[in-house]
Amino acid sequence: MTNFIIITAANDKYFWLLQKFIASIRDHDAGREAPIGVLDLDLSSENIAWLEAHGARVCDPGWDYKMAKAEDNWFKAMTARPNLPKHFPGHDIYLWLDCDTWVQDWGAVELYLEGAARDGFAVTPEVDRSYDYEGFYDFQYSCYKTGFGRKMAKKLASAPIINCGAFAATADAPHWDIWSEIFGACLAKKVYFWAEQTALNVAFHTRGLEASFL
């Protein structure tokens, strides 16, 4: 069996979602003993005890970057994401899923793990022929312009969004360091909500990174 860990993050406000997320994993035969890591974004001692009783490892990641302005602890879910192997060492593959995810079909987990094992990184672009893209360009342009300037925004705003709410990567994938480098440079100048996902997209679209796109 692949040595993997599923990682997410939450604070007390979103703990009820985190509980359902963990239940959706444990409900599958393959997920009953699956390692789970939780980034502590201000969890009470009672909630941490519940997580540990359900087999989860809890980690306060601290701040991984020097930032242009201070943020509340919930922002650690963003700053820790390119650094998961550092916070939960000892695994071959790291699968990140936002805590509002529900694992309905374990086959989806396997697709991410298999994609990462094969190509180093597995992730899903937000693209489909049935999507309505009205307003999409303006949103993307704003994300790129805020963190990376007009030139980058013009170059990448029409590209599909690579969603970092669900991805898997091997511990030694080059993507981690490249993503972290780009994200850190962004945060030194501008801190904003979509910065970590925008940095990942810049990494893919400008550094020639390969992945299994699901």
Can you annotate each of these PLM segments?
Residues M1-L214:
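Glycosyltransferase catalytic domains, chiefly GT-A lineage
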